[in-house]
Amino acid sequence: MEFTSTIKQNYEFRRLYSKGKSCANAYLVVYCRKNRAGRSRIGYTVSNKVGHAVVRNRIRRLREIYRLHERQIARGYDLVVVSRVRARTADYHQLEAAFLSACAQLGLLTEGDDGV
C-alpha cells in the first residue's frame, strides 16, 4: 500500500470504535477518524464468528480492495474495516461495492485518483 500504513495496536482500534464516525452495510462496518499525519492508516477485523481460518482469510481480500482503490480514498484518515458474518457468503465484487459505498457515505472518496 503506497500511501497507507496499518493499525495494529488494540488501543488504536478501540479509539476508532469509540470516537470515529461509522458506516455500516450488510457486509461491513467502516470506522474512520481524521488523523494528524499526512498518511492514512487502516486496520482490519474479522471475528472468529465469521468462520474458520480459510473463510476469514478469504474475507481478508479487503486488503486488496483497499490497495486497488487507495488513490481514490482521501489521505490523512485512520480506518478500521470490520467484517460482518454475512460477508462470508459475499463474492469479491459485493465486498468491493460494500467497501466503496461505505467510504462514499463517510465522505472519504475523492474525485481524482491522486487521493488529495
Place the predicted regions along the sequence by residue:
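Positively charged, solvent-exposed patches that mediate nucleic-acid binding
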Residues: 1-116
